């Protein structure tokens, strides 16, 4: 399965994952308005992966299948502090 990743023009470190070739039809208009202009940053082949930076491929595929998209928000401040202290 291929997945397209888009970066938000309005929100830092915010990304939208869509099935490859999807035209944003499953993304709510309210979310698209807050997301701003979507800049495509990459296409990922999920077939040979188990883990992405912040979630498993299985979890991402569940979101894509059930919702038609996955919204990745910036990590919470506490998460950043824990990662720095490791």
Swiss-Prot record:
YcgL domain mapped to chain residues: 1-85
Gene3D superfamilies, alphabetized: YcgL domain
Domain of life: Bacteria
Coiled-coil stretches: none
SUPFAM superfamilies, alphabetized: YcgL-like (SSF160191)
Transmembrane stretches, start-end: none
PANTHER family, alphabetized: PROTEIN YCGL (PTHR38109:SF1)
The name this protein goes by in its record: YcgL domain-containing protein IL1825
Taxonomic source organism: Idiomarina loihiensis (strain ATCC BAA-735 / DSM 15497 / L2-TR)
